[in-house]
A protein has these predicted regions:
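Catalytic cores and adjacent flexible loops of soluble metabolic enzymes
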Residues: 1-300
Length: 300
């Protein structure tokens, strides 16, 4: 088994994390992103231009993105559901955007009120406009292992929708285990199916730690050639389908794993942990990251 020498971390805490937490002030969101920008991260998902009616925690994304201190080495991206969201994101200074659909019909209907096929059709005008502006588009694919409504997701279905997103024009597809039920054997089966169609360089993994399997699943993905991992500082973001359970895998834990495996990320673990402590203190809770907790205990 050969592991990659380098891994890119996509920090999703300021968006995917905070949208599932109690509200945080605009000032503290800006502060968090500025701290993260100083850690060596190359990609931070900074906001979302979904209707505030659906995601009220992200209503200030424009103000946040227009007031962060930008580093030339960092990509600041935003989630955009449609053409209007794209225009708003670009106006706010996003230099990359992301679209989202699901590998499961049930989740697609519950989450974005349409079929998978309809969701892909809706993205076509956005993709045309993004191409016109030379803005890269990332595709998020939810429920690649299981769905809270439909049960197990077929690996072939995951491969089909991943391929559709690539054909639509996405430079990369992030494969999301939305309810965190995946285990390495199931992740292996899913990735084998997707990798038969799409090269590893155009795939990322996005694991939730709801059932404590995220790091094991990331290790499995790394062993299969995946070199981009989504994660959230301090483990921000609960799981909306399991009340009180953890959601996104913590960036600190992923960094420690990579460090131990001799994989370069370019990210300073201690600086990132400090950013996590700041936002966790604001939220008045502990980081879900075990590495973060151990580091804080050691430094106190």
């Amino acid at each position: 088994m050969t592991l990659p020498t380098n891994v890119t971390i996509v920090e999703v805490g300021p968006r995917d994390g905070l949208q599932n937490e109690s509200p945080v002030s605009t000032r503290n969101k800006i502060r968090l992103i500025d701290l993260l920008s100083d850690t060596g991260l190359s990609h931070i998902e900074a906001g979302s231009f979904v209707s505030p009616k659906w995601v009220p925690q992200m209503a200030d994304s424009k103000e946040v993105m227009q007031n962060i201190t930008r580093r030339a080495s960092v990509t600041y991206s935003a989630l955009t559901p449609n053409l209007q969201g794209l225009e708003q994101a670009l106006d706010a200074g996003a230099n990359q955007v992301a679209i989202f659909t699901s590998a499961s019909e049930g989740f697609c209907q519950h989450n974005i009120n349409c079929s998978i096929a309809e969701s892909l059709k809706r993205f076509e005008p956005l993709m045309v406009q993004a191409d016109k502006y030379h803005v890269p588009v990332r595709g998020y694919l939810s429920c690649v292992v299981d769905c809270p409504y439909d049960g197990a997701t077929s690996p072939t279905q995951v491969a089909n929708i991943s391929q559709a997103l690539i054909e639509l024009g996405c430079y990369e597809v992030s494969l999301g285990d939305t309810i965190g039920t995946g285990t390495p054997n199931r992740v292996k089966e899913m990735l084998e199916s997707v990798l038969a169609r799409i090269p590893s360089q155009r795939l990322a993994v996005h694991f939730h730690d709801t059932w404590g399997q995220a790091l094991a699943n990331i290790y499995q993905a790394l062993s299969m050639g995946i070199t981009t991992v989504d994660s959230s500082v301090a483990g921000l973001g609960g799981c909306p389908y399991a009340h009180g359970a953890s959601g996104n895998v913590a960036t600190e834990d992923v960094l420690y794993l990579c460090q131990g495996l001799g994989i370069e990320t370019g990210v300073d673990l201690e600086l990132l942990a400090k950013a996590g402590w700041m936002i966790s203190d604001e939220l008045q809770r502990q980081p879900t990251s075990k590495v973060s907790q151990a580091l804080r205990h050691r430094m106190e």
